[in-house]
Amino acid sequence: MGACTSTCFLVEDSIIKPNLNIIIMESENINDDLKITNQAYQKVKLLGTGSYGKVYLIKSLQTQKEYALKETLITKNKEMFLYFSMNEINILSKLNNPYIISLKCAFKTQIDEETEKLNIIMEYVDNGDLNQLINKYKDDEKFFEEKRLLNWLFQICLSLLYLKENEIIHRDIKPSNIFLLKDDTIKLADFGISKKVSKEDSMFIGTPVYTSPEIISKKDYSYKADIWSLGVTFLQLIFLRLPFLGEDHETLYNNIIHKILNPKILNKDKTGYNEDIIKNYSKEFIDLIDKMVSVNPDDRPSVKEILNKAIIKTRMELYLKENNFDENEIINTFYYLFIYIIISY
């Protein structure tokens, strides 16, 4: 793992232990027997790599609980990675929601005079992300059931409602940032480019294919930008194809701004969606998703309006019954309280 100064303690190459002197943040929402920062961790396996660095599955040697460790190398020419990582830490440290990935702690490791490693220990989500699942279904020539998509939709909307209550826009909603537990519960992740809302913004940021027309046009935008990205995500879940394409960024942006959809998700005369696919879904569901990708943000439903749609409220009520939640569970926990309020609205 390289040379290390006194700002961290390495038992061996695959075991790490945060040093209390250089802890950046530790969540207050921890129910572990031991504080995160008092534990040593065994690296189990590499989960993924990216421009930000690497993500490992780690296990506490004391409690045997599993977590994800994101490592980002910070050098003078990669200060933007530090900005995004610190932004994610600052945002996640203030959040506590069952549909949002939880941050446990963050700490630094000094590698050499010019390089630091930023370490973020997070909740481990054990069943992959929606992008992986989309690719699997496409390979198997299968389609998602509407019931399953509705379950995911209301869970994500509950997380967005919580973010809105905390004045936060995610700004990068896409399948690869939506993770799944084995019980099919979703976890919204990657808050590196999220922001607190003090006023409408016009900064161009996000993943181009999922970015809203108002962001691309450098107009002011707010929470409805997340609704667009969520709508694009669900079009992709329905058709197993990207809704917007372009041989270059200019073409892609033009297609998004004018809602020129991928021809392969349209019917032959391009007057509507591919009927061979949408026949598997209710008109109410398709109409809702289509409304979410309205070019004018004022025409998109808000999170509360989505959650109060009859098709969503019915699915939430059935979800509660299918999972045998009693009234006390509904009332006494944060997540079920949200559902209880909404379906009683």
Task: Locate each region found by the language model.
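Conserved N-lobe ATP-binding subsite of Hanks-type protein kinase domains
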Residues: 54
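Conserved short submotifs of the Hanks-type protein kinase catalytic core
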Residues: 115-129
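Activation segment signature within eukaryotic-like protein kinase domains
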Residues: 152-153
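Conserved N-lobe beta3->alphaC-helix segment of eukaryotic protein kinase catalytic domains
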Residues: 66, 71-95
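Conserved catalytic-loop aspartate of Hanks-type protein kinases
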Residues: 226
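Short beta-strand micro-motifs within the conserved protein kinase catalytic domain, predominantly
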Residues: 102-115
